Amino acid sequence: MKLRNKFNKVTAWILTCILFFTMAFSITSEAYGEGYTHAKQFKNCHIYNGIDVSTWNKQIDWNAVKASGIDFAFIKVGGRGWGSAGTLYHDSRALENLKGAKAAGIKIGVYFFSQAITEKEAAEEAQYTINYLHTYGISIDLPIAMDFEYASDSPTGGRLRTANLTREQATNVCLAFCSYVATRGYTPMVYANKSMLTNDMNASTIASRYPIWLAQYNSSATYTGAYSYWQYTSSGTVPGIEGRVDMNFYYSTDGSFSSKINIPVPTGETAPADAKIVYATHIQTYGWEKEETYDGGISGTVGQAKRLEAIKIRNNTGIEGSVEYQVHCQSFGWMDWTMDGDIAGLTGLAKRLEAIRIRLTGQLAEQYDVYYRVQCQTYGWLDWAKNGQTAGSTNYAKRLEAIQIKLVEKGGMAPGNTSKVYVSPLIGYNTHVQTYGWTGTVFDGTTGGTTGHAKRLESISITNLTETSGNVVYRVHGQTYGLSLIHI
């Protein structure tokens, strides 16, 4: 993590003097932070000393780091390349650092160097980070941070800079990362420097929901927004680390560390003990349902035009096995499979669920089939899907409004009709139009191109979207060139 445009020593000294008398206080910590001035809102906080590291810090003697007075460390687990491809990568020393810091008794959090330019990419980065922790069985004490900054190693500032996102777009990208992390039970956090927080995003919107990690390399932080961590230099020296290292303060109101948050859950009566499958949905405007639903009951709303935004399902039979479920979410597409009461979908982003798949595992799958049907915008109640089939729609931008889920003894009769469980386009086509270029894919009889604009069609691409084998074969007659080759 790097910053530009540092104050020179004279400016920093002047600001320190001014802020000392008007809005701040100074402390000298046990080992670090001498001469740094903290904003007055942190006067009653416990202030911890920490670092953040990556492969660039080489091999670290974590016992020496701990002995020197370092309380916590944020460790890079990976990042996204700043080139146009935006390839995800892992930090080669992440696992070594995570295990070493933890063994030394240092509180740990993680960060991911983001170059996300869409909400979907941001969720992908969050998913990558959490999957990394789960793969290696790493438990953390501090938040999962999105390192949102322009690429200082790139002459152009990287793909994040060249994307030229609006403040609203950048804010939504950060919120997408945070929402994904939060729905998985971790505390998310956004790292950014003062300039980005002030000029390139709506930091107050983010800070109203999630902690901020400020980067500002001064002897006092002049950023006036809310923040919980302050990275105050990239030139620190710590025993056990070769060369310079990023240094941080953490302001704790109660003296504790935590990487988990309390996810809102249904607060009303729980399902009866003899219920087989239990579920709850997060509904537009209303949030989580007050009571859980079970065994074929309707979860959600009917006739109110409210989208489902997230869902939790759990096995209540006592039989070995799990309920696994996967949702298709607006802007994000198919998300990871989730299981046994974990949240699928996203809350706080106003994104609709569009389709769902549910399946069983273990002894549960041997004894039961799972049936489910959804109330879908425009189409109403679809028929009952079974054992991993897709229920709902994709490519039509239609919201799910309600769902029923039921376990049926293996081979037993379905709860109702099973013929129409999923609505999807049969054919998609994209046209290239004079002046406008490619206009975007449309489906099943919708007009592609323009009318009334006197613009010529210059090219077309047609795709078979059915699950039936075979191809769409087409050719066009073009000005000057006549009939084209056959396209498949």
Task: Kindly give the residue locations of the regions a language model identified.
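Bacterial N-terminal signal peptides that target proteins for export
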Residues: 3-14
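Conserved small/polar residues in nucleotide/adenosyl-binding loops
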Residues: 486-488
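Fold-core signature of tandem repeat domains
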Residues: 277-283, 308, 313-315, 323-328, ...
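Substrate-binding cleft of extracellular glycoside hydrolase catalytic domains
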Residues: 35-38, 42-176, 182-184
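Aromatic-lined carbohydrate-recognition surfaces of secreted/lumenal glycan-active proteins
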Residues: 186-198
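Sec-dependent signal peptide cleavage junction
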Residues: 21-35
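Functionally critical loop-and-helix segments that line ligand-binding/catalytic clefts
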Residues: 34-57, 63, 206-270
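Tandem-repeat/low-complexity and Cys-motif detector
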Residues: 297-304, 315-316, 342-350, 360-364, ...
